[in-house]
A protein has these predicted regions:
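Extended catalytic core of nucleotide-activated donor transferases of GT-like folds
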Residues: 14-126, 144-145
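Nucleotide-sugar donor-binding catalytic core of glycosyltransferases
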Residues: 8-11, 17, 129-165
Length: 165
């Protein structure tokens, strides 16, 4: 895939994540399009020109762009992502139980990514019908193997026991 769609204009921190990732992908030679949730209809026109089937993916956080927003979803027609067969990679920052209703109607090529091992286990158990693309540690998070020798403290379930601090 040579083209990446990211979303901005929604939750400020999620837009920040998207912009930072987009900057790096641009540096790596990918074409990046920012769909602006504050200007959905104008962004939708530009989005349709940007998408090249077979070359474009959506990378989003917490279902932004997958909530039937104007510009990416039309009643009776569905998502633009399905129309152009765009794979949708959703990095779920919050616990999956917040998203039960959103999981009811998603694009055909929806892929779920968890940032927490417990969220990942919950998602696999209660939503086996979706393709899970695994665990993505938060940037700046240390891997368990690196954390133990440096701190001498136990890391359990991706969390440091507060009594050990």
């Amino acid at each position: 895939m040579k083209r990446i769609v990211l979303l901005v204009g929604g939750v400020e921190t999620l837009a920040y994540f998207s912009i930072q990732m987009g900057n790096e992908w641009k540096r790596m030679g990918y074409k990046v399009f920012y769909f602006d949730l504050e200007d959905e209809m104008n962004s939708a026109k530009k989005l349709r020109r940007f998408i090249k089937p077979g070359e474009t993916v959506l990378v989003t956080f917490n279902f932004e762009g997958l909530e039937k927003e104007a510009g990416v979803y039309r009643e009776g027609i569905g998502y633009v992502w399905d129309e152009y067969a765009v794979p949708c990679y959703n990095i779920a920052v919050d616990h999956p139980y917040y998203y039960h209703e959103r999981l009811a109607d998603l694009p055909e090529k929806y892929y779920h990514i968890s940032i927490d091992r417990l969220h990942e286990a919950y998602f696999k158990q209660f939503y086996p019908e979706f393709t899970h693309r695994g665990f993505l540690p938060l940037a700046g998070s240390r891997l368990e193997e690196l954390c133990k020798p440096n701190t001498g403290k136990e890391v359990e379930n991706n969390r440091l026991n507060i009594r050990q601090k």
